[in-house]
């Protein structure tokens, strides 16, 4: 290896240490982890593709690091010169290298966070003040509630065992990493964690280092790009893989920790195994709003698949339980059941089992009971498998478990018997874990929500009323619709027969209801209606459930997402509750979903956040008035523009009384991996949600003072006006947006099964919130997040400078306002208007340059005003750890941004001149066929060879670097 290459290799480490010069604490190993992964990767890169490629990567990195230090745009031009001189194969290798290095930096961060957390637990306290505000350790929370708020242990226990957090996994098209890679990333994390363990021998260290290099190389050699869009079944399988990997075992482990925390505050009883603390639901295969690929058949398949997976997971554990429960003493109640089972069981039915394959003798009573449970689980799985494969099964339903009570009954019997015989400690072992899994996951693993647009139900109702000859439902007033729906709901006659004339769309809606009727009711959760505005939207779904013979109707959940819908939501709910039939039907419980994405796209983050806050307060008041317990279902995205942000803070900043021990929240696309990708991440997620929900209920945040509200109302009007004047009223905004961002190329990423537009060839209104945010995140300009804040602050400060004091008081005393400001501050820390200016220079027509300049001036002004309100001199001065992590990531992202901007230029402007230099990459397999082979992976591209793949790799890399996509 040449001498200068060695110098360069050390210089990347040196650059890293320049970016993050000093350790933030004794347990700060981030730069160490990052440097190790980077060194290993660069050695692998050199072995695979030669010294020249390694040097080019290092040159780009160093120029990017220099840009980050000096913010000199000349550096960006220099990176551009290096990148445009590459041939297509080299271009792909270099881009892939940066994308890969960013992923390694993320993995180093995760290992560092886990390491600091372990140190914290050993010390028994928070590492620093910051983590106290962003972490929610369950034990810490219980102690705080008792000591600071003087709650009794019993009060805490009662609140905890009655609360529910329902996490709803959605396949939103934002998980841009393939599963093949996610698994390799998990193994890299494990190797890195073990390498830094205290008691490791030199031999183990060497073996781990080799394993680490193997995994880094395997990940680098895997195609990052999905070559076909995932189907809803693919998305469902990907989501379910997290249950298999972490959630399944993570839940009982977490509940044991809750038991320990309770014991430490003086509660000598465990959480009841059926306490519904954590529940899981899913939208994968149930969310048909704007996704024509989710058909009734797919919904049916997804439910059967989930049942099969659940039975598989139980089957894998039941024999361990049989080994554990080898006792012969049992209660009389259990003995009766054992004798009955023993008499009726056949001797040769268990040959297909590995363990306990002969009939179990009655002298092992628990094993007799569990053997019967095992048979039923086997049949449950096989029946689901047959139905999935052919739609038919010879296994009768009565030989399977059809509902969770049937499944729990024999397990509860074993538990009671063990306790009665003095073996409670045995009962509280694996059996308790198993009972908790059954209570949490049931037979369906997750409950599937159905989501459909209200218009689709109106179409069905219209077809029915036309068929009955009573006019057009669509043209009726709301009063007339309600009157007719209620008379039908109160009546007994069927509404229509098989001869109802149906278009494909109408058949699709009705067939979905038939699937709900056909499958076991525990497969389903809520029926969510998007674009719901009136009581008739909800009543129509109730009537369709009855007409299609849904035995146990799903609860109907209206979803309010646009700003105007949120404003009108309380009145809509009051009208719904005033319908006596409906009040009798819901039994004092209602769920309402509020959408963060569309409200943000519609009015900007400031106004959306404030309107969501006020809407929740008003909805809760309406529910109180009618004596209804309201559960809020939060449709949050991963990005700040779509309502994302740290879980703990997001929950604690909700209005008082809006959570009250029951919370539903979506865990979307890219956030699933960050929440459940590893055992410790899964544990942390469950802990954060549980602790923050408990704290919000027992120690609600303060209500805003009247003068704060008045100021917020005034600012929201100004913020909305500015946001809309630019996004919707500026005549050339859409043109600028499409030129200055990769929005038009987004669809090529094959991220999700859902189209990125509701209607082709329309403006911003029809663009889904996800690609809208994705495009601005890619250029690091984040316009939807900050636009409006600056105008709002400027307006109230110009009006009266004393308002600055009020705003600072709001920031220091009101959690909602603080979280809103802190999240935007974090986005500014990730943003870079210099990068956005490069996109403008290369991609936007000259007559629009002044528009981009104006937006960037607005960005800078907003940032300064935000810092003034927060009382900060620099961005993130209160969170040095996050600041350090972002500094380390920035150089990689900058190199990818420059590459992306030039790729877009080459794709969009065929006349753009580039002068490729000599081919750099050497490939060890065949010197005649180097990296150019990579170009052939994409056979469908309409662009010049290699351009599309390079562009997609930049999108994925930047998404990994921003740690959120859409």
UniProtKB/Swiss-Prot annotation:
UniProt KW Lyase keyword: yes
Protein name: Phosphoenolpyruvate carboxylase, housekeeping isozyme
Subcellular locations according to the entry: Cytoplasm
Active site annotation, chain numbering: 172, 601
Cofactor(s), names only, from the UniProt record: Mg(2+)
Function recorded in the entry: Through the carboxylation of phosphoenolpyruvate (PEP) it forms oxaloacetate, a four-carbon dicarboxylic acid source for the tricarboxylic acid cycle.
PANTHER family noted in UniProt: PHOSPHOENOLPYRUVATE CARBOXYLASE, PHOSPHOENOLPYRUVATE CARBOXYLASE 3
Activity regulation, free text: By light-reversible phosphorylation.
Organism of provenance: Saccharum hybrid
UniProt-listed InterPro entries: PEP_COase (IPR021135), PEP_COase_bac/pln-type (IPR022805), PEP_COase_Lys_AS (IPR018129), PEPCASE_His_AS (IPR033129), Pyrv/PenolPyrv_kinase-like_dom (IPR015813)
Domain of life from the UniProt record: Eukaryota
Quaternary structure, from the entry: Homotetramer.
Gene Ontology molecular function: phosphoenolpyruvate carboxylase activity
One GO-annotated biological process of the protein: tricarboxylic acid cycle
